[in-house]
From Swiss-Prot:
It comes from Macaca fuscata fuscata. Its EC number is 1.11.1.9, 1.11.1.12. This is Glutathione peroxidase 2. Transmembrane segments: none annotated. It comes from the Eukaryota. Gene3D superfamilies: Glutaredoxin.
Length: 190
């Protein structure tokens, strides 16, 4: 089991361009974390909606995408290939993320990234689908398997500006529909 940080601000990740992303710099802002994949059926929808949310709250929201290949091998690009895959394949059309993508990682199992160990400890299941599980056991490629595991690509975690993990959303919950919760956390009029 991965070490579980005491505070969200103790965590960090490495961006696709190799820079350390220190979560301590996010104080006072809401943070949306989503495990992403460039070859999933909802890649275009979710990446486009992540850009929309980042553009709507440019100074008060941090969006972080964590590429992961644990679900149907749908992020089989190397770190240095991910941006080109997004730009030319899916979503394509010159797409460029307006948010930070970090290096590929595992979100479940023995080698899960510390960010996901922390988030799954604080938010053990999606609020919109508390019974969500991986639907096909043949696709489970990690061990150990836990009830709190991320079930598929594009699960989302929203952390409030006061550092409290606020809510976890299933893969079927449209990313853009998180906006009212972001406004609530940021105390912006709806």
């Amino acid at each position: 089991m991965a070490f579980i940080a005491k505070s969200f601000y103790d965590l960090s990740a490495i961006s696709l361009d190799g820079e350390k992303v220190d979560f301590n710099t996010f104080r006072g802002r809401a943070v949306l974390i989503e495990n992403v994949a460039s070859l999933u059926g909802t890649t275009t929808r979710d990446f486009t909606q992540l850009n929309e949310l980042q553009c709507r709250f440019p100074r008060r929201l941090v969006v972080l995408g964590f590429p992961c290949n644990q679900f149907g091998h749908q992020e089989n690009c190397q770190n240095e290939e991910i941006l080109n895959s997004l730009k030319y394949v899916r979503p394509g059309g010159g797409y460029q993320p307006t948010f930070t993508l970090v290096q590929k990682c595992e979100v479940n199992g023995q080698n899960e990234h510390p960010v996901f160990a922390y988030l799954k400890d604080k938010l053990p299941y999606p609020h919109d689908d508390p019974f969500s599980l991986m639907t096909d056991p043949k696709l489970i490629i990690w061990s150990p398997v836990r009830r709190s595991d991320v079930a598929w690509n594009f699960e989302k975690f929203l952390i409030g500006p006061e550092v409290e993990p606020f809510r976890r959303y299933s893969r079927t919950f449209p990313t853009i529909n998180i906006e009212p919760d972001i406004k609530r956390l940021l105390k912006v009029a709806i």
